[in-house]
């Protein structure tokens, strides 16, 4: 664990000077997990397995032993060293929604979360800061899984829609899977098929390439809440609201066996990934069970929860470490090879099933948690997922917060065990490990940090409108954005876009307004409808109109409003009828070349276009019909940009220049 300074020296606020005359703001330090040193230390001192695994220096409760920390792969036989007992960071969106699914990307660099609003959110896996957000579904996302080849991502929502995604979040395909909400899905070992569980009481096996249904598994009497495909065998497991756990043969669609171990709705079924010999299930009866697939019976009964268990997950390295999340926000960790008797000692330890004379008839061994985090979240934990390296656990909850957990560093155990997540806010405040005012302040600081991360988030990959031939200003017609007065030339300046130079019209000069004191220059052409005036002569002002004291239009509008008069709707709007073809609305000047109106000389801006009428002849339009809406609200909804370009930008600022 290292720390990243929160000062932003480049922008002038945070660590350096002030910004716009304001004093610098100190953001403190953001915790960052740097596991590179631990992995390098393990790689340098590791030994082949046949000679015995490297145990390394024993970690002692002192900060000086932090350098001896090793990744979980270095100590496969010591799962207690990988128990995530320390809170790292809490990540929350600006617009908060319940987090239904959390999934680490296959390489472990980012965490992907899916919310009830149908949005994907990417969090950095090292600094836990916000990276990007996108609208993935129209309804709540209920399931999310990566393929075993790491080439595809499949998501399912509350409307029964299944979507295919590439790793860069390019939506390739969208199919209708079920008519009811889809609760879970899983890939086959070779990624050619995947299975879904739905509230319509069925499971469906889909062909991934064709997107068609190969098989429908029926047999549950109520909603199917969970499913999983064995990582190396042709075996599917499902859990339902009818309290049953069923095992299926995906080749024939036949139900192999039914496990009657729970007394309430099954919430999660998951195969163990390391050896593949066990199956874990959780239910709303406050228990979780571990089944041995070789004996087709339960071998362990996980107790300790005071409320329903909503989810569980296996450790990716240690096959005997299981974590569960409760509906009350508690997070428990179980070591399956240690019984960990009841805290009050009321239950005597029972030997394991494998140690009895008759394993087929022996009762399941009760196991109590090796570590408890009773106040991990304020509400139910919906999803848990381990980092591929096995050192960080991510949790998503109904309290709209995504939290990261890791093992305590040497010397941090007493402090981490007495925080508000372990003993509660009141007890932590009494012990001095948490301050209520400071907690609110930290929550505000975290929200401000997320806002800053959003400002530095990934930009939209949609290209801006390029300049059209003969049209400057990035593709915008002159005279549309900035009104111009005939007779006033436009200033030609180089354009910042790739389209080259263009005209940027200055604001109009009105006599008597601002710093304009002169009269407009003479017009180079006669005004239609005034044959008595020679060319170049400006007509006199209307009687009672003082050019030095122009009328206040806001005051006139207020007077009309008080008198009960409504201003006429603008021509071409929804409330005003369009005139017949060939007749202009009242108050509009005919376009150049119509009704005897002369064309403007070269270099002059054309007049504004008529509402509801087409553009000028030969005018170019945008390829997508002008429906280009750039989202500048602070949220960047786009796929990830190139990492090489980001690296070059950082190197140009002087960062990441040293070779590690």
UniProtKB/Swiss-Prot annotation:
Main location: nucleus
Keyword Repeat carried by entry: yes
TM spans (from-to): none
Alphabetical GO biological process terms: chromosome segregation; mRNA 3'-end processing
GO annotation, cellular component aspect: mRNA cleavage and polyadenylation specificity factor complex
PROSITE patterns according to UniProt: WD_REPEATS_2 (PS50082), WD_REPEATS_REGION (PS50294)
Record-linked SUPFAM superfamilies: WD40 repeat-like
Skewed-composition ranges (Pro residues): 566-610
Keywords on record: Chromosome partition, mRNA processing, Nucleus, Repeat, WD repeat
Biological role stated in the UniProt entry: Required for 3'-end cleavage and polyadenylation of pre-mRNAs. Also involved in chromosome segregation where it has a role in chromosome attachment to the mitotic spindle.
Record protein name field: Polyadenylation factor subunit 2
